[in-house]
Amino acid sequence: MIPARRRLLTVLAGVSLSAFAPPAPPSYSIDAIRYATVPQFPLRALVMGAPESEKLDIAMVVWLIRGSGKVILFDTGFHREKWMKQFTVTDYVRPDEALRAAGVPPETVTDVVISHAHWDHMGGIDLFPQATVWIQKDEFAYYTGAAWQPGGRHGGIDPEDVAALVRLNTEGRVRLIDGDDVEILPTIRVYTGARHTFASQYVRVDGEAPVVLASDNCYLYRNLEARAASATFTPEDRDANLRAQERMIALAGHRDRVVPGHDPLQFARYPAAGRVARIR
């Protein structure tokens, strides 16, 4: 009788403790989706110190993060014709249609995280009608204001994209992130300091094997391997970019878990089918 009673008490104690146990953190899958290619892009524009003659077909990519009822897109690509002509874009599929082809209707995207305001990263924010848009507060403020004043810098920024961002803000769909190392969604954190644009950010997706999605804060694996800066907001920001790359490696726990912004090798290093590579 006593052993049976003890067993019952043990079971009841376990049930009681489990009621107060914290919920398990969300587990996200991560996919890279290639929606276009820019052929024969000068490597020197991507990797400081690269030979002038070297060129690369760069991948145009958005990243899909899914789990716990969330469908999150990191960067949105672009769809304006002028940029296709300027950069001789090939193999193009509009980003929302690239998602649909991967089995994800664009209207199911719950959140969009913008790394920075350049045309090929923020240019598709109007393609995902139900999504909340996350962007750094300082990036929003600069590119809707001082960037267009005398002495401002707005290279690579499309005024139509800025207008779309402002409109979404007036509709209550924009969330402004205030600074570095902020958890915007459970186990998804953003970090600043790489200075690709005025206040560019990158994402860490936590888990047993954390992944850092660098976007243009680190263009290629070659940046990491050669410890070479990506393009920065001003030339004086190069050291900040290198420090950020080191931080990305530390945050990911290994250099191989840092995913660069435009490297076609991510579709060779990870299992891939068509336009989609499974990062995790």
Label for each model-derived stretch:
Residues 2, 7-11, 18-104, 108-120, 138-192, ...:
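Metallo-beta-lactamase
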Residues 31-33, 113, 134, 175-177, ...:
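Hydrophobic/aromatic beta-strand patches that form the interior of the parallel beta-sheet core
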Residues 189-201:
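Active-site glycine- and acidic-residue-rich loops that bind
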Residues 35-36, 76-79, 117, 138-139, ...:
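Active-site metal-binding loops of divalent metal-dependent hydrolases
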Residues 126-129:
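Short, conserved loop/helix-junction motifs that constitute active-site signature segments
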Residues 89-92, 200-280:
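Cap/insert and terminal regions of metallo-dependent hydrolase folds
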